[in-house]
């Protein structure tokens, strides 16, 4: 029997699992465990039922929990790993990392990676323009004007679904997020959407034209490769871009929202290990999931191998924070106050279409009414249903 793990292609994801596989094999001689990688774009829009039929363990993010529960393609984990994933185990993980995978009373994923939208910047360029790390959106615009005066830019990621993710973060920061239950999206508040859409437009206008094709990895890559992107206020953070082997080590800070507390409300990401209901060797797969979780919670080794664990123990580890140039300390407050996306079965498809629509609207200069109407149509809501109540 063998265990095949589906992962996504960045060293943040691959390196910690490779270490976990090696140490697992040392403890279980003869175990056949391997990982397969695929691009980030496939990860963000995966057909979860199909990959669950092909792999024993699938690394995924929480918006798929509704589809997973409805299809039965994964096995719930809370009864098999109660000491790591039980109702009283949330404090083992940063922010709502564990809660995001609890849907309809079951835990569908074991949190292995912790992330939310946070700010990132080039310390050398920030000093060059004479700016400070922004705390609020108003500060972001002031820094953006300084950057443009110096021939530099802010940065943003517009490729699906990242523009929409930033809009969701700004809305949640104002205390008026999109509203959903376990079955459907219920409301897209017009007032908070209008301000969030404008905030995203503001940042886009201060970003280079090429940003229209960037996802979160692209934005980090561009920030270390070129010398004219000073800062981004909202991107899914990659701690590895603060490591010493980068051409320019990035610095990290909390999400810069519209209202105080400015760091709060960013849209949580991260990933978890899901156990396929059709795993070829269930016991070995479950044993590997336990082993991988303990690598972060007990041994604190994920951050020492390019990863950013969901385990709180690693976020509190000063040496890991040093390795990543302050990533954990810089984004800690945003992780602790992050907002969780809806998880009803149809949400992943809504997110995909909404991401395409918001990127298109922003690039075309569409007004708030048109953009809001498009979102409500995609969600199957009338515009009145999407209005603030």
Please state what every model-predicted region is.
Residues 1-65, 381-389:
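Conserved N-terminal structural module of periplasmic/extracytoplasmic solute-binding proteins
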Residues 63-69, 234-249:
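A ligand-binding cleft/hinge motif common to bilobed small-molecule-binding domains
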Residues 65-116:
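Hinge/lid segment of periplasmic solute-binding proteins
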Residues 108-110, 141-185, 229:
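Extracytoplasmic/periplasmic solute-binding protein
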Residues 303-353:
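Long, aromatic- and glycine/proline-rich binding clefts that accommodate carbohydrate-like moieties
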